[in-house]
Amino acid sequence: MPKHYRPTGKKKEGNAARYMTRSQALKHLQVNLNLFRRLCIVKGIFPREPKKKIKGNHHTYYHVKDIAFLMHEPLLEKFREIKTYQKKVKKAKAKKNEELARLLLTRQPTYKLDRLIRERYPTFIDALRDLDDCLTMVHLFAVLPASDRENLEVKRVHNCRRLTHEWQAYISRSHALRKVFVSVKGIYYQAEIEGQKITWLTPHAIQQVFTNDVDFGVLLTFLEFYETLLAFINFKLYHSLNVKYPPILDSRLEALAADLYALSRYIDASSRGMAVEPKVDASFSSQSNDREESELRLAQLQHQLPSSEPGALMHLVADNNKEVEEDEETRVCKSLFKDLKFFLSREVPRESLQLVITAFGGMVSWEGEGAPFKEDDESITHHIIDKPSAGHLYLSRVYVQPQWIYDCVNARIILPTEKYLVGRIPPPHLSPFVDNEAEGYVPDYAETIKRLQAAARNEVLPLPGVGKEDLEDPQNLLYAGVMSRAEEAEAAKNKKKMAAQEKQYHEELKMEINGSKDVVAPVLAEGEGEESVPDAMQIAQEDADMPKVLMSRKKRKLYDAMKISQSRKRSGVEIIEQRKKRLNDTQPSS
């Protein structure tokens, strides 16, 4: 028997040994499809794409090591135990033994995903990097109505709302918010925590409707994992501020749907108490609860104090009592709305504006009981309103639309309010997530904002083609001007020569077509022979194609893809400019 002989079925090699199909994985684990999906979601296992699919393209493949990883998961045994226990409950209900069924439901086995969080995210930075989808999902379910058909319970909706308010309270107190954009899908936010940029989407404050084309079973499994992950992150973030977690809210404010305001007051009171009294004697342990409650009430009453007052005690690290070093971006964001007081009308998105204003150093209030200050407060500087008001108008404040808040935040300056007054069409709401220079089109209002930013920094905007280093070094600018003038003169001379040669070529070609025997004297430059001169455009095209000929196939394809992308971008810019021109032409007539 030759050495290379291998009996069929004895050993697999290559992709057949590294991957298995989903049906093979189900047989290997002895679970159904729903349970397999739950395990893959909570464990972070996803399908693979092998280069050579042994069983065909219509199968889903998983790595063999991932399936072996699931085989030894303790959660698998817990799911089987729960399934067996549910059969006992079902049997008791079938025998109409309601008391036994109720007793069994109270003793049903439970499980936690804490171990999986620590397993999937060894460090806190790893968890922050994977937080975008988590925040978007939790914010979505926080506004959904409870549904028995989709197995969405009320307590789960309340838990999502609690987690989102805790997250927003930390973002507001730490001034970590960086960008906000209101779109048709919802409101996009971007915050920066420990150097990580976190972007999430929140739905608008309207009635949400369940759709039939979404598998809510899979979404609820993701939500179960994301709730645990966000609770871990909130715990870590609150302890970095010396604040106890979970927070204890004022029941009165919580009943008035002022959860975010109650959380902010709780953070202020907790940080003040922990920073002033880092150690408490055991003899005063009986009075500690009363002291904490009194400080919480005091913080709720002292709502008119700006957040940059002795609340700087919030910026203490948990392990040592030293101030946290703030970067320049945080300092700018913290003082953008400093000493400004805003009042929100009923029709504006209160929760979003409250988060944005407080995150950038402002004070905010609203209509209703439990608000920090009343509408008739003379110190209010801006009244956020979305429709003309028939009530009393105060001359000491400015009535602006909500878009003014978001545009000021993205521009990092206080914009003029003339274009945002009530009843006027506001300027375009520009996205801070788009790089206008890279896209090749800069809107007019973006240029206006850039000039306002330069004026706020007492800077001089350079002319097109002139950089800041040229303004700082005039001699360099003069030298560049002289060189560019010499280059322009030489280019003009070459252009004139090429035009003469091209004209001669066209005349010769025309005479040849007409059958004329007259010969036009060639127009030659000094030092050139009597050879026929090719077209200037052809020479330029050959020069442009020469580097492409010398490229490898891979680089040539990449170059072609870049050219296609640039042409599409240029065509998109041309479409935008045409629409802008048509709009400008129709505006005066209307």
From Swiss-Prot:
<dbReference type="GO" id="GO:0043021">
    <property type="term" value="F:ribonucleoprotein complex binding"/>
</dbReference>
<dbReference type="InterPro" id="IPR036420">
    <property type="entry name" value="BRCT_dom_sf"/>
</dbReference>
<dbReference type="GO" id="GO:0005654">
    <property type="term" value="C:nucleoplasm"/>
</dbReference>
<dbReference type="GO" id="GO:0005730">
    <property type="term" value="C:nucleolus"/>
</dbReference>
<dbReference type="GO" id="GO:0030687">
    <property type="term" value="C:preribosome, large subunit precursor"/>
</dbReference>
<dbReference type="GO" id="GO:0003729">
    <property type="term" value="F:mRNA binding"/>
</dbReference>
<comment type="similarity">
    <text>Belongs to the pescadillo family.</text>
</comment>
<feature type="domain" description="BRCT">
    <location>
        <begin position="332"/>
        <end position="422"/>
    </location>
</feature>
<dbReference type="GO" id="GO:0000463">
    <property type="term" value="P:maturation of LSU-rRNA from tricistronic rRNA transcript (SSU-rRNA, 5.8S rRNA, LSU-rRNA)"/>
</dbReference>
<dbReference type="Pfam" id="PF06732">
    <property type="entry name" value="Pescadillo_N"/>
</dbReference>
<protein>
    <recommendedName>
        <fullName>Pescadillo homolog</fullName>
    </recommendedName>
</protein>
<dbReference type="Pfam" id="PF16589">
    <property type="entry name" value="BRCT_2"/>
</dbReference>
<dbReference type="GO" id="GO:2000232">
    <property type="term" value="P:regulation of rRNA processing"/>
</dbReference>
<dbReference type="InterPro" id="IPR010613">
    <property type="entry name" value="PES"/>
</dbReference>
<keyword id="KW-0539">Nucleus</keyword>
<comment type="subunit">
    <text>Interacts with BOP1 and WDR12. Interacts with NSN1.</text>
</comment>
<keyword id="KW-0698">rRNA processing</keyword>
<dbReference type="InterPro" id="IPR001357">
    <property type="entry name" value="BRCT_dom"/>
</dbReference>
<feature type="region of interest" description="Disordered">
    <location>
        <begin position="561"/>
        <end position="590"/>
    </location>
</feature>
<dbReference type="GO" id="GO:0090069">
    <property type="term" value="P:regulation of ribosome biogenesis"/>
</dbReference>
<dbReference type="GO" id="GO:0000466">
    <property type="term" value="P:maturation of 5.8S rRNA from tricistronic rRNA transcript (SSU-rRNA, 5.8S rRNA, LSU-rRNA)"/>
</dbReference>
<comment type="function">
    <text>Required for maturation of ribosomal RNAs and formation of the large ribosomal subunit. Plays an essential role in cell growth and survival through its regulation of ribosome biogenesis and mitotic progression. Required for normal root cell growth and differentiation.</text>
</comment>
<keyword id="KW-0690">Ribosome biogenesis</keyword>
